[in-house]
Structure formats: structure tokens, C-alpha cells
Design a protein with these regions (language model features):
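Extended alpha-helical scaffolding segments used for macromolecular assembly and cargo binding
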Residues: 1-98, 105
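Extended non-membrane alpha-helical scaffolds
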Residues: 93-168
Length: 168
């Protein structure tokens, strides 16, 4: 059946992308991941397809950062797509990572207000889930964003909260 063949071809393209990444062949990896995504999108829309696309988009983002730059519009679009798919599938951890990646794009672009907004979203997400690892990452975003914006007391408070969670 055609759908099964496409699903299998998508897996092979994903594996080719992973192999290209392992060999530092970022351009080739991007091409493989983009082809895999395009094949996947020809399959019927299901939650599983959205999950698979989120994983492929995430992998694409990693390779794309190397060739387009962390501040690129193309990379921001990939992270936005992962965030959207993660919301639709209820994958909070992947959504958190996508938001964190968007924060990183905004920091690289010196877009401090946007970085603060994304940081607030990360903090709310981490606190609502109650995951200490996510909370530590959200605090890292918070103190990294507050420090350069001239808020030393808030930065210190955020660092103290993070330090209390840190367990080497």
C-alpha cells in the first residue's frame, strides 16, 4: 500500500539525515529532513503523523542552525512549527524545547522583549507541569534574560531558585 511505502521512505530519509548529521554534513541533513517531511505530509493527518513531523522538524532545526545561523528566520519557523505540533499532540516536553529554542533565536537577534515573553511562557509551562528539570531550564532562561536587561535583584532571585534545584 502507498501509505506504508511512504511511511517507510520517510523513515529511511530520517535515518539518512541522522547519518549526515553524524558526519557533520549539515546541508545534506537538511535536504534529507526536508524531503522526509514532505513525504510525511502526503500521508493522512493523524496525531502520530504530527508527532513524527515534530521529531523531523526538530532534527531539521538542529542541522539548519549550522548552515542558516541561530538567528535565521528559517530556523525560527521550524521551531514555531515544532511548538505548534507539540501543542496539538500534547507533548509538553517537546513544546518546552521548541519554546526554549525560540528564546535562543530571540537572544541571538538581541530581541530582549520577545526573549522575556518567551521566558515567561517557559516559566509558566515548567511551573504548571511541576517538572524540576524544566523549571531549572526556565530559571536559566529567566536569569540569562533578566541580567542583561538591568534587573540585578530579580536575576539574583532567579539564580537562587535555580541553585536550590540544582543537584550535581
Amino acid at each position: 500500500d502507498v501509505a506504508r511505502c511512504l511511511a517507510r521512505a520517510t523513515q529511511h530519509r530520517q535515518r539518512a539525515g541522522q547519518l549526515a548529521v553524524s558526519r557533520a554534513a549539515s546541508r545534506e541533513a537538511v535536504a534529507h529532513y526536508q524531503h522526509a517531511i514532505s513525504q510525511l505530509l502526503s500521508l493522512p493527518e493523524t496525531i502520530e503523523r504530527k508527532r513524527r513531523e515534530a521529531g523531523l522538524q526538530d532534527a531539521l532545526g538542529g542541522a539548519l542552525a549550522h548552515i542558516a545561523g541561530v538567528e535565521s528566520d528559517a530556523l525560527a519557523q521550524v521551531h514555531q512549527r515544532v511548538r505548534e505540533l507539540s501543542r496539538q499532540t500534547g507533548d509538553v516536553k517537546r513544546q518546552f524545547v521548541a519554546e526554549w529554542n525560540l528564546w535562543h533565536v530571540h537572544v541571538a537577534r538581541w530581541e530582549h522583549r520577545r526573549a522575556e515573553t518567551v521566558g515567561s511562557s517557559l516559566m509558566a509551562m515548567a511551573e504548571s507541569v511541576g517538572d524540576p528539570e524544566l523549571l531549572l531550564q526556565a530559571l536559566h532562561v529567566e536569569w540569562s534574560t533578566l541580567g542583561p536587561s538591568g534587573q540585578p535583584m530579580a536575576t539574583r532571585s532567579s539564580c537562587d531558585r535555580g541553585w536550590a534545584l540544582y543537584d550535581p
